Regions:
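Positively charged n-region of N-terminal signal peptides that target proteins for export
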Residues: 1-4
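Sec-dependent N-terminal signal peptides
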Residues: 6-12
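Electrostatic cytochrome c docking/interface patches
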Residues: 20-47
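Extracytoplasmic electron-transfer domains, predominantly the class I c-type cytochrome c fold
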Residues: 44, 62-128
Length: 128
C-alpha cells in the first residue's frame, strides 16, 4: 500500500511540474522575440492545430506524441528540423509551411495563420 501511495504521489508531482505556466518574464521575452506573439494564446493554439498529437510539449495536456520531436528547449537548439537556423522568423515559417522548407517532412501543412504561428512560436520559446 505504501509503495502504491508513493508512486501515485510521485506521478501527481511530476504532472504538476509539467503543467507549470511560463513566468511573466518568459512571456515578455517571447513576445519581443516573435514581434508580438502571445505565448498564452500559443499554448491554446497548439491544441487547436493538433501539434500535441505528434509532439511532446510541456504544459499542454495530452501532448505525449511519438512522431515529432519533443519541443521543450527548442529556443536553445541551433537548427529547426535540421534545416533552418533557429530564429523566430524561421520557426514561424516552419510552423506555417513545413513542406516548403523540407518537402519530405512528416509534419503536415495545417493552415496555421501568421498570427497563430507567431503565438505558437512565442509559447515554444518559453519552454525550458
Amino acid at each position: 500500500m505504501r509503495t502504491t501511495l508513493f508512486l501515485l504521489f510521485a506521478f501527481l508531482l511530476s504532472m504538476s511540474s509539467a503543467c507549470e505556466r511560463p513566468s511573466r518574464t518568459e512571456v515578455a521575452r517571447a513576445a519581443t522575440l516573435t514581434g508580438g506573439g502571445n505565448a498564452r494564446a500559443g499554448q491554446t493554439e497548439i491544441r487547436k492545430y493538433g501539434c500535441n498529437t505528434c509532439h511532446e510539449i510541456s504544459g499542454v495536456p495530452g501532448a505525449r506524441g511519438l512522431i515529432g520531436p519533443r519541443l521543450d528547449g527548442i529556443g536553445e537548439r541551433y537548427y529547426i528540423a535540421g534545416e533552418l537556423t533557429n530564429t523566430p522568423n524561421n520557426l514561424m515559417l516552419w510552423i506555417q509551411h513545413p513542406r516548403q522548407v523540407e518537402s519530405h517532412t512528416a509534419m503536415p501543412e495545417m493552415g496555421v495563420t501568421e498570427q497563430d504561428s507567431r503565438d505558437i512560436a512565442a509559447y515554444l520559446y518559453t519552454l525550458r
